[in-house]
Amino acid sequence: MRTCKNGNSYEAANKLFTVRHDGTRRGGTDEKGSHWHGEQVMNYLMDRENSKDTDPFLIYYGFSHPHDVRDGKPELLKKYGAVNHLDPNILPPANPRQPPLPVNWLPEHPFDHGHTTVRDEVGVKGVWKKRDERTIRNEMGREFACSENIDIQIGRVLRKLEEMGELDHTYVIYTADHGMAIGRHGLQGKQNLYEHTWRIPFIVKGPG
């Protein structure tokens, strides 16, 4: 089975999955955010359990966060001192609980790298063209909130696999397609060749 955001997957590959769930948008609620993806996987595992299905399985768990728009859940945003900022005419509130600025933060990129006007650099809700400290720290808090929600949803699935007796013989692979600048080098998006963009996690856990 697989989950993904509608429009962000490859149809030829989708046809190989017998169970497919597409989220229609990213959001900061359980109905539209990472919890929704987790719920689809949990339902799939419970269906396997109830039907006593012992065939091998593949789950592609395709979260759409922390890609923008990084609308986090209220309780996680509060933990990281962030808000889902909506007004491009004012700065988000400062909060000491927000993550610090990245060590390589810059207020602007020092040269035109060829992608300074793409949507990722000028049109992301909550940041737009701003690179000031308050905006970037708030956006980092939103990213942390969205990333922690992914941790929570993966934890739900791992506990369910353990409860079913499946975890010890299941390979779990955690990776991503790209990173994101969020103020590093004065950039916001992914259209660049800095390490913060092309370096991604790759974690494998399983038997053997």
Task: List PLM regions with ranges.
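Active-site segment of extracytoplasmic enzymes that catalyze sulfate/phosphate-ester chemistry
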Residues: 1-2, 6, 11-25
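Active-site-proximal cap/lid insertion segments
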Residues: 24-31, 35, 44-208
